[in-house]
Amino acid sequence: MLKTRIIPCVLLKNSQLVKSIEFKDFRTIGHLTSTMRIYNARNVDELIILDIDASKSGEIDFESIEDLAKECFMPLTIGGGIKTLEDIQKILNLGADKISINSKALEDMDFISKAGNRFGSQCIVCSIDVKRKGDQFCVYDRGNLLEKSPLELALEYEKKGAGELLLTSVDFEGKAKGYDLELLKIFQNKLKIPLIINGGLSKPSDGVEALNLGADALAGAYIFHFSKYTPKDVKEELARQGFAVRLL
């Protein structure tokens, strides 16, 4: 049985690690090196770092990525500003294990296939940000709501060769009120690739609810920095509920 992964998902901004609320109102988590050492000590399963400066400017902070990778002793996913296969090659050469693509995948779905063919689909994570519009869920990209079904987009990404999907609820992101379960229900039993749910994790029982609705891995930021819970607390609750986790 595959083990459920607990994955801190944090943002890189001005060479600092931060978290946000609804992709705004940023709050500093800490310096790159010290934060990596905390994650190492807490034995998290993986780490996702999204470079939001690069997403806006198109200039990837390779120096910070190198600093992160040197201190990171767990599988590391880097996203933000990736536009070319050469960008991916450089990020992987610096020590990352996977890359996450969002806007580039929307612009050019064939890029997913090209990246998967060159580097292996197992290291290609496609990211979809979702925001509600009334009672509908829409894909959210750089401040714009797209008239595109998140599930349809995810299925297209899967067909193009994505290895995993990172699904983030913008409405729930950073609010610490649990995952968007209505969003998860739309995806339940629809994908063959692993689904990482992100946005809203506030306590271990939130993770149980998400896994019961088909999530394969749990991502979060607030819970691991601004609450009393640690990754171990989440894992222990999952284990009590019968889910396979990596406990040391």
From Swiss-Prot:
Keywords: Amino-acid biosynthesis, Cytoplasm, Histidine biosynthesis, Lyase. It comes from Campylobacter jejuni subsp. jejuni serotype O:2 (strain ATCC 700819 / NCTC 11168). The keyword Chloroplast does not apply. IGPS catalyzes the conversion of PRFAR and glutamine to IGP, AICAR and glutamate. The HisF subunit catalyzes the cyclization activity that produces IGP and AICAR from PRFAR using the ammonia provided by the HisH subunit. Heterodimer of HisH and HisF. One of its GO terms (biological process) is L-histidine biosynthetic process. This is Putative imidazole glycerol phosphate synthase subunit hisF2. It catalyses: 5-[(5-phospho-1-deoxy-D-ribulos-1-ylimino)methylamino]-1-(5-phospho-beta-D-ribosyl)imidazole-4-carboxamide + L-glutamine = D-erythro-1-(imidazol-4-yl)glycerol 3-phosphate + 5-amino-1-(5-phospho-beta-D-ribosyl)imidazole-4-carboxamide + L-glutamate + H(+). It is found in: Cytoplasm. GO terms for molecular function: imidazoleglycerol-phosphate synthase activity; lyase activity. One of its GO terms (cellular component) is cytoplasm. Its EC number is 4.3.2.10. Pathway: Amino-acid biosynthesis; L-histidine biosynthesis; L-histidine from 5-phospho-alpha-D-ribose 1-diphosphate: step 5/9. The gene is hisF2. SUPFAM superfamilies: Ribulose-phoshate binding barrel. The active site is at D129. Its main location: cytoplasm. The lineage of its organism: Bacteria, Pseudomonadati, Campylobacterota, Epsilonproteobacteria, Campylobacterales.
